[in-house]
Amino acid sequence: QGTIGIEQLAEHPVMLTPRGTTFRDALDQELAASGVRLTSAAEVDGLRLLASLAYQGYAPALLPASAVSGYPEGDWSLVHVEGLARRSVGLVRNRRTTPSMPSRAARDVVLEVIREIAPHQPGIHVTLGG
């Protein structure tokens, strides 16, 4: 596992998700603020398909770390891109109502799975508050 800066990344064509997808739009906005523009080797709809193509060696791909977990070791490597903000994932509920028992049970299971599995996933940083 290595590290590359966003300026270095811009020197190479990479496979990306298409414009109009949440991940790509957030990425383009963040890179534009840094004055960096990427060259697309291909635009592929679907993070798992994009990860699979990169794993098979078609071209490097820019993906969230969660999209590449589970691939066996081989002739590929996970490279951290410095200069990109970490993405956050949250669990949202309405504060004006009391959560139902099934909602609370689902929340508890989600938190348990995150605490158990996420720390073992490369590139995933757990920041649970409670």
Residue ranges and their predicted role:
Residues 2, 7, 42, 60-61:
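Residues that recognize and position ribonucleotide moieties
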Residues 2, 19, 23, 42, ...:
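Residue-level signature of the cytosolic catalytic core of signaling kinases
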Residues 16-17, 36-49:
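Short beta-strand-to-loop elements that line the ligand-binding cleft
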Residues 1-2, 26, 71-73:
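Short, charged, surface-exposed secondary-structure boundary motifs
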Residues 33-36, 71:
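Short helix-capping segments at alpha-helix termini
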Residues 8, 48-98:
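Beta-alpha-beta core module
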Residues 126-130:
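C-terminal regulatory/oligomerization modules of transcriptional regulators
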Residues 5, 13-34, 99-108, 114-125:
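Secondary-structure junction motif
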